[in-house]
Design a protein with these regions (language model features):
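Acidic/aromatic-lined carbohydrate-recognition and catalytic surfaces
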Residues: 43-159, 165-169, 173-206
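A conserved hydrophobic secondary-structure block that centers on an alpha-helix together
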Residues: 203-211, 215, 219-220, 299-303
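Carbohydrate-binding surfaces of carbohydrate-active enzymes
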Residues: 2, 6-28, 39-46, 52-90, ...
Length: 671
């Protein structure tokens, strides 16, 4: 523990403001931000509404950068004055409309008697047909759909038409491309209703770099080398629908014109004859096919977007961070990116946002996914964009306490930077310069918040949560189940959201009762990259075959393996009963917390540096009985206390304490 950092008055590791629009008086603005205890800002080229990056506004941005440099204020660069990142102030698609996001949908025609011949013509909302094929169904089975996908016949087609001739027992599938737009995040994002770029097309991202980032490098060469990091904001594939209450005519999977050839080159087989299995489960090969497909999609998004922008920024002396869409649920990790973890890992510094900013309504697993990614990348933690969006009126009713609570949770789970959209009352500093900033945190609250997170960083910075109990991040199960919907109602299906629902239950039962877990994925288990005492597999239908073998190895080494509800089968269809045991979350809790029981709603996270973070999510003070002698760091009060074994301490609500186990000889009164 570095007591200089604990006691130091500096602004390092305090919160940053998301500051998009600067007043003319830059010095007064910087003075105010510093006076409220904040560290720095996330800012951008001052593009007017509906405008684009130009030499003139880059010149203005250069003046801002020079002033920030002169005043010693750290800054991040927000990659565009617009949202979501990637459309380049709407310039990319204005130049190249062919680079818009695309989706592939299926039309199916089957015949059980007689013969039928017709021409199918696509509708006016669609672009073109890209594949059509006919298969034979076994009509002797009057219960199930038994289709011979190995004996398919490709059908000739034009851009808009295909002639289909069916005999009894034949099925035709037609695969059609259209814009991924209606009902997507394109039209439900609070910023614009413009179409978005195709993340499967590397040229689309190159065009974004040309439109938005290259002008900064040319007109303000110091900007990228000086900035902390570049902040990108929620790019996505746009093929999933955003609202559960809307329905559309097309269930879409991600598509680009190069997709079939690239898939074949990477996975070693032709995707096209098996395309129906991305939409329906009429052959047991659907599980492996979908895992291969969504893994491929994740690879391409990671390379084209995060990887390409990161590589370009490295050439400018900068790094990529920011955050991506829908961190909270694994099913959205698949629908929005194919493989969310791979995409985030391809940036330099992982990040997330938090829109539910109430300790009573918190997505507890979301920061834990980022903690896993941070561990994999070897970063000191991750960034959080703090944005009270949902239930804002409840947040505002007690904003300071809610902010302190969320900061406690986030830092406990590994966050090391907070960039906030919840602003302080800078109008109190200078009403002429900040006429619109009369709401938010007061100066006293801002100073207290910033001192709080700086002291937490002094204790936990440079370390990470320990992986003693591991929760399996079962992406393969979600991939294997993934089929496109005509609505954003995935979460309403207990089958598609089985893993997410199970993880929510574990957060409620384990985390809220003092038993921490950290996520580990197939790569971690197969590679032996974690050394836990227990592995929990949440409720699921499938695990990767390699994961099954890894679980057997871990159990042979003495690690406890728990399955939830029942044992799954492997993606290849293997059933197994020779590893682990089946039990529920309550039974896992009883076993994993041993003899030590914390009060309900007290969260405990051990760290690899020997520290233990303890957070009280109760609305009142909670009495803790100290098990072992410990030094206790209270980052809100700024106090350090020695507590003996068996001593009791009252912990305030919504606060984090850090415990450091000490030996008796360290007690100056001992002996």
């Amino acid at each position: 523990m570095d007591m200089k950092k604990w006691n130091g008055p500096g602004r390092a590791h305090a919160v940053n403001l998301m500051f998009h629009n600067w007043p003319k008086d830059l010095d007064t603005a910087i003075d105010a931000i510093f006076d409220f205890g904040f560290s720095g800002v996330v800012t951008n080229v001052p593009v007017p509404k509906g405008g684009r990056v130009t030499r003139e506004n880059v010149r203005e941005f250069s003046g801002i950068v020079q002033k920030l440099k002169e005043r010693g204020m750290p800054f991040w660069i927000y990659d565009e004055k617009g949202y979501p990142s990637g459309h380049g102030c709407h310039q990319v698609l204005a130049r190249r409309p062919d680079l818009a996001a695309k989706g592939l949908y299926m039309r199916k025609f089957e015949l059980f008697s007689g013969e039928k011949s017709f021409v199918y013509t696509i509708d006016g909302m669609s672009d073109k047909i890209v594949y059509a094929a006919k298969y034979v169904q076994n009509l002797s089975d009057v219960t199930e759909a038994v289709i011979d996908f190995d004996g398919g016949e490709a059908l000739p087609f034009t851009r808009r038409r295909v002639r289909i001739s069916l005999r009894a027992g034949e099925i035709a599938y037609v695969f059609i491309v259209k814009d991924a737009y209606e009902g997507s995040h394109c039209v439900h994002n609070c910023a614009s209703r413009e179409k978005y770029i195709n993340l499967l097309e590397p040229e689309a991202v190159r065009e974004f770099i040309r439109c938005n980032l290259e002008p900064i490098a040319e007109g303000c060469p110091e900007a990228f080398p000086l900035c902390e990091r570049v902040f990108t904001d929620e790019p996505s594939l746009m093929t999933a629908y955003a609202r559960w209450y809307e329905s559309f005519n097309y269930a879409l999977i991600p598509y680009s014109d190069k997709m079939f050839g690239e898939f074949s080159a990477r996975k070693g087989y032709d995707l096209r004859p098996l395309l129906p299995l991305l939409f329906e489960s009429t052959d047991e090969r659907y599980k492996k096919l979908r895992v291969d497909f969504y893994s491929f999609i994740g690879e391409r998004v990671a390379e084209n977007y995060s990887g390409q922008i990161s590589a370009w920024l490295h050439g400018q002396g900068a790094e990529l961070s920011g955050h991506y869409l829908a961190e909270e649920n694994i099913y959205q990790h698949v629908t929005e990116y194919g493989d969310y973890v791979r995409v985030v890992r391809s940036a330099d510094y992982p990040g997330m946002d938090i829109l539910y900013t109430l300790p009573t309504d918190f997505f507890w697993n979301a920061p834990k996914y980022l903690s896993m990614i941070s561990r994999k990348k070897g970063t000191d933690g991750f960034m959080v964009e703090f944005c009270p969006f949902y239930k804002r009126e409840i947040f505002d009713a007690n904003a300071f306490e809610n902010f302190m609570a969320c900061a406690s949770i986030l830092y406990m789970y590994g966050a090391r930077v907070i960039n906030t959209y919840f602003m302080p009352r800078l109008k109190d500093y200078n009403a002429e310069v900040f006429p619109d900033f009369g709401w938010g945190l007061t100066r006293e609250e801002s100073l207290r918040l910033n001192a709080y997170v700086r002291r937490i960083y002094a204790c936990l910075g440079g370390s990470r949560p320990a992986c003693r109990t591991v929760m399996y991040y079962n992406l393969e199960d979600v991939m294997a189940k993934a089929v496109p919907h005509i609505s954003g109602d995935y979460f309403m299906s207990s089958y598609y959201s089985q893993t997410d629902n199970s993880l929510t239950e574990y957060a409620r039962v384990l985390l809220a009762n003092g038993v921490n877990y950290e996520f580990a994925d197939r790569e971690d288990l197969v590679g032996g990259k974690v050394s836990p005492r227990a592995i929990i597999v949440p409720a699921c239908a499938f695990v990767a075959d390699e994961t099954y073998e890894a679980l057997k190895r871990y159990e042979a080494e003495g690690v406890k393996v728990y399955f939830t509800g029942r044992r799954p089968q492997t993606v290849s269809g293997r059933a197994f009963s020779d590893v682990g045991e089946v039990c529920g979350a309550a039974e896992v809790l009883a076993r994993e917390r041993g003899g030590q029981a914390f009060p309900e709603n007290v969260y405990v996270t051990p760290y690899v540096n020997g520290m233990t973070a303890v957070y009280n999510n109760n609305t009142d003070k909670t009495c803790l009985c100290i098990g072992d002698r410990a030094r206790v760091y209270d980052p809100d009060a700024g106090e350090v206390r020695e507590l003996r074994a068996g001593e009791k301490a009252e912990m305030p609500p919504y606060r984090l304490w850090i415990f450091e186990k000490t030996a008796d000889e360290e007690d100056p009164s001992a002996g």
